Amino acid sequence: MQNKPSSYDREDLLASSRGELFGPNGPQLPAPNMLMMDRIPLMSETEGAFGKGKVIAELDITPDLWFFDCHFPGDPVMPGCLGLDAMWQLVGFFLGWIGGEGKGRALGVGEVKFTGQVLPTAKKVTYEIDFKRVINRKLVMGLADGRVLVDGKEIYVAKDLKVGLFQDTSAF
């Protein structure tokens, strides 16, 4: 993909969920409700804590988001696993952005720490992904560290997020 955009809006992300952004063999983002971001203001192959790539994405928080009604009734909070999944989504999106093909699958995470929460009163969640290693050969895989911020305050940190792209997932 020559002259790749360095940012994406909601319509672009929805196109990715339909398989229209990175071509017929590229990875897809999930569709709403599991699409956990509204925009990606930064995509870079050279920035980041390790100089191997950086992604910043944002999710606007409103009290009517689907997960607040069910997690938990009377004590609404965004499930931490959705923030973790968003970070995996962004690692896979980056792999498609650099030209990787296949179906994205989360392969693991080394360590996750939760030190805060996303409440319905929040305004914005920001995800920051710093790539440590990217393999784009027969095997397509990304290894990254990530963090989640709510209204500018760090609340989750993930080390060694791992995502791979697979041509065949039947034996996965």
From Swiss-Prot:
It catalyses: a (3R)-hydroxyacyl-[ACP] = a (2E)-enoyl-[ACP] + H2O; (3R)-hydroxydecanoyl-[ACP] = (2E)-decenoyl-[ACP] + H2O; (2E)-decenoyl-[ACP] = (3Z)-decenoyl-[ACP]. The keyword Isomerase applies. InterPro entries: FabA, FabA_FabZ, HotDog_dom_sf. The active site is at 71. It holds the Pfam family FabA. Its EC number is 4.2.1.59, 5.3.3.14. GO terms for molecular function: (3R)-hydroxyacyl-[acyl-carrier-protein] dehydratase activity; trans-2-decenoyl-acyl-carrier-protein isomerase activity. SUPFAM superfamilies: Thioesterase/thiol ester dehydrase-isomerase (SSF54637). CDD domains: FabA (cd01287). Keywords: Cytoplasm, Fatty acid biosynthesis, Fatty acid metabolism, Isomerase, Lipid biosynthesis, Lipid metabolism, Lyase. Its main location: cytoplasm. NCBIfam families: fabA, PRK05174.1. Belongs to the thioester dehydratase family. FabA subfamily. Homodimer. This is 3-hydroxydecanoyl-[acyl-carrier-protein] dehydratase. It comes from Aliivibrio fischeri (strain ATCC 700601 / ES114) (Vibrio fischeri).
